[in-house]
């Protein structure tokens, strides 16, 4: 049988490879020194998609054959490995990975895995110290992040994991069908924000945590809400991520969450998303449709999945974003 040539694409921030030889993926994987050993017949082609963001790196792989994987994680970066499909068993570092569990790999730690069939996985690695300082600290979460240490973790909210898988699938689809969109920094920042949101939700439903600061009573939570509103007003012309808000107020994620749930009945992530919709609507009403597009404004406010943006926008305001844009010229 004639060998099938691998298909490879790279434009700097996005890399895509599809091949029949599973071990060929190893040379393209980032932030790990990895060896892949095939242990069964090839069922489908294998593939790897990589997207480099500012604070994190996303790698999505599909192994089209049973394999053994031996790897050493980058000495400067840590990360999370998730397995998406559950139709074949996978063992990582002696732990069976099921629908609610995933692996954390510290800097320079060992990854030893065996999979007995097809495997689709996600690896999210963080720039040096970002996980500890910008995710775990606001969450008040306890995780052993020492070098050479790995941990088997269990998430208590399947919906949080499913949200990650959905977002990663959408990003991967863009990488396959429209890779030039990754040259738009507003779009890539929006994608990164979505990935960070999923990590916040997953870790908050996985790790034991303690409040960074202790606030008791309605007065303290009222103060947090007032400070949040003041901060958002002072930065009204730029999108704010929930981690930025935690940092600005010097409060933990759990404290912020309880305050927003008490006063608004929604999480701070949802609140900030609604604020971004309101800002996008403001810009649509003010914009000249001859010079500005809906996608330009959506991307500015970190909405990168334009189909979802249109549907959710219409659900909020009873009209499509394009109708708002054209209506603005009539006012």
Language model features with spans:
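Conserved short histidine dyad/triad with adjacent acidic residue
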Residues: 41-48, 56-73
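Alpha-helical DNA-recognition elements
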Residues: 262-263, 315-316, 327
């Amino acid at each position: 049988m004639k060998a099938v040539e691998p298909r490879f694409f790279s434009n700097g921030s996005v890399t895509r490879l599809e091949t029949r030889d599973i071990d060929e993926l190893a040379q393209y994987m980032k932030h790990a020194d990895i060896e892949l050993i095939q242990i069964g017949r090839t069922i489908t082609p294998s593939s790897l998609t990589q997207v480099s963001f500012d604070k994190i790196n996303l790698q999505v792989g599909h192994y089209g054959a049973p394999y053994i994987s031996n790897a050493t994680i980058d000495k400067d970066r840590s990360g999370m490995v998730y397995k998406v499909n559950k139709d074949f068993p996978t063992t990582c570092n002696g732990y069976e990975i099921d629908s609610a569990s995933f692996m954390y790999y510290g800097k320079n730690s060992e990854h030893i895995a065996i999979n007995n069939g097809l495997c689709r996985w996600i690896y999210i690695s963080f720039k040096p110290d970002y996980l500890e300082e910008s995710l775990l600290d606001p969450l008040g979460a306890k995780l052993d992040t020492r070098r050479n240490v790995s941990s088997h973790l269990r998430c208590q909210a399947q919906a949080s994991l499913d949200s990650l898988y959905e977002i990663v699938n959408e990003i991967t689809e863009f990488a396959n069908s429209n890779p030039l969109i990754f040259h738009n920094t507003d779009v890539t920042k929006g994608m990164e924000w979505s990935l960070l949101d999923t990590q916040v939700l997953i870790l908050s439903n996985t790790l034991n945590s303690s409040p960074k600061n202790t606030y008791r009573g309605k007065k303290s939570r009222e103060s947090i809400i007032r400070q949040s509103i003041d901060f958002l007003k002072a930065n009204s012309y730029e999108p704010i991520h929930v981690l930025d808000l935690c940092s600005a107020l010097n409060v933990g994620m759990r404290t912020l969450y309880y305050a927003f749930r008490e006063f608004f009945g929604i999480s701070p992530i949802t609140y900030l998303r609604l604020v971004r919709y309101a800002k996008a609507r403001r810009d649509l009403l003010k914009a000249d449709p001859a010079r500005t597009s809906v996608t330009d404004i959506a991307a500015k406010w970190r909405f990168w999945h334009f189909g979802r943006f249109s549907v959710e926008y219409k659900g909020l305001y009873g009209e499509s974003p394009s109708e708002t844009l054209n209506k603005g010229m009539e006012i």
